[in-house]
Amino acid sequence: SKVIGIDLGTTNSXVAVMEG
């Protein structure tokens, strides 16, 4: 999830970390 969030963008990165 973290990698996906970072790949999409900084904003989504935070969401990915929360989901992960």
Swiss-Prot record:
Task: Decide whether keyword ATP-binding is in the record.
Answer: yes
Induction, per UniProt? By stress conditions e.g. heat shock.
- Record keywords, A-Z: ATP-binding, Chaperone, Nucleotide-binding, Stress response
Q: Which PROSITE patterns match?
A: HSP70_1 (PS00297)
The keyword Chaperone is annotated on this UniProt entry: yes
Task: List the Gene Ontology MF annotations in alphabetical order.
Answer: ATP binding; ATP-dependent protein folding chaperone
Q: Which Gene3D superfamilies match?
A: 3.30.420.40
Q: Which Pfam families match?
A: HSP70
Quote the function comment for this protein. Answer: Acts as a chaperone.
Spell out the family assignment given in the record's similarity comment: Belongs to the heat shock protein 70 family.
| UniProt name for this protein | Chaperone protein DnaK
Per the UniProt entry, what species is this protein from, by scientific name? Clostridium pasteurianum
Lineage start: Bacteria, Bacillati, Bacillota, Clostridia, Eubacteriales
